[in-house]
Amino acid sequence: MDVHGAAYATHGKGVTGIAALDIQQGVSLRDYSTMRLGGWAAYLAHVRSPAEVEEGIAWAEARHLPVIMVGGGSNIIWRDEGFAGLVLVNRIPGFELADQGGHLLLTVGAGENWDSVVARAVAAGASGIERLSLIPGTAGATPVQNVGAYGQEIADVLVSVDAYDRQERRFVRIPAAECAFGYRRSRFNQADRGRFFITALTLRLLREPPRAPFYPALGRYLEERGLTHPTVQQVRDAVIAIRRAKLPDPAHVANCGSFFRNPIIPAPQAAELLRRYPDMPHWPVPGGGVKLAAGWLIDRAGFRGVADPETGMGTWPAQALVVVNHRASSTADLLRFKQKVQDEVRRRFGVTLEQEPELLP
């Protein structure tokens, strides 16, 4: 770490090396995660084109430094040790909607704000991502964890991902069929974690009204308002209203959204739990497993709306699945609180909860 001592001591000072990039030295990473925790980056630069991504990588490699790329920071948590290399912050713009006759092709820059992408697509009459409204972060993050909500996920509409392949040292286009999508998983956060720096993605959307069946909470909301044949804009508005009612705004309350994945357990284990807890929410999934609601498990374990005095962390009163940073001073505090929740859920239900936000580096 001694080689980066000057970087950590000179916070915010620009360094030279690439004319096109403004590479900052010694930058707090708390501003690059909506949980607002973590250490310092030795170097950080905002990239606004694929060429700048390639330049940033070359700059770091020439100095034998590790390099990582992030988006809006809504699904990442930085370690207290920070990052002793170059952090590239994806700000690549772009929005192009092309009519293909029976469908629409939407190509967006990976640095675009995701909800702004959804809003523009919906305003153009396109359907397919309206239920993914108000999800924080950038477009480039959506295929990484196969973002999903209210019965839609990015894998349903993705055509391809454009990215810089650090292994092959060239730009590539990856078809959706080669992304290895699963529940909140893809090759980008599993087998090929860190290999691809996503620069753009192309989606296949429709000019059709949204189709039922709707996710239960969304369906009830629409039915209560007499919207039996809702427009795509009405579905977006409904999703926004539901999310705002139960989820904190990361701009005002430090959080990363859903902190734990909904666990999938074997059917016999689910049957035993249902015998003990008949009201437990559950859904069958392909392969014979059963998905449980992590928020319900956390709630029943006694962690809904808590404010832990030891760690400064807590959970959101309207949705126990959301871990919030009240006054934590370190990522270590967050990880201690996470362990408390996991231990109690495991003790009561025999179910292990997995963390959803990625711990970096």
UniProtKB/Swiss-Prot annotation:
One of its GO terms (biological process) is cell wall organization. GO terms for molecular function: FAD binding; UDP-N-acetylmuramate dehydrogenase activity. Its EC number is 1.3.1.98. Its cofactor is FAD. Pathway: Cell wall biogenesis; peptidoglycan biosynthesis. The active site is at residues 184, 258, 356. It catalyses: UDP-N-acetyl-alpha-D-muramate + NADP(+) = UDP-N-acetyl-3-O-(1-carboxyvinyl)-alpha-D-glucosamine + NADPH + H(+). Residues 35-208 form the FAD-binding PCMH-type domain. GO terms for cellular component: cytosol. It is found in: Cytoplasm. Keywords: Cell cycle, Cell division, Cell shape, Cell wall biogenesis/degradation, Cytoplasm, FAD, Flavoprotein, NADP, Oxidoreductase, Peptidoglycan synthesis. InterPro entries: FAD-bd_PCMH, FAD-bd_PCMH-like_sf, FAD-bd_PCMH_sub1, FAD-bd_PCMH_sub2, MurB, MurB_C, MurB_C_sf, Oxid_FAD_bind_N. It is an enzyme of class 1 (oxidoreductase). Cell wall formation. Belongs to the MurB family. This is UDP-N-acetylenolpyruvoylglucosamine reductase 1. The lineage of its organism: Bacteria, Bacillati, Bacillota, Clostridia, Eubacteriales.
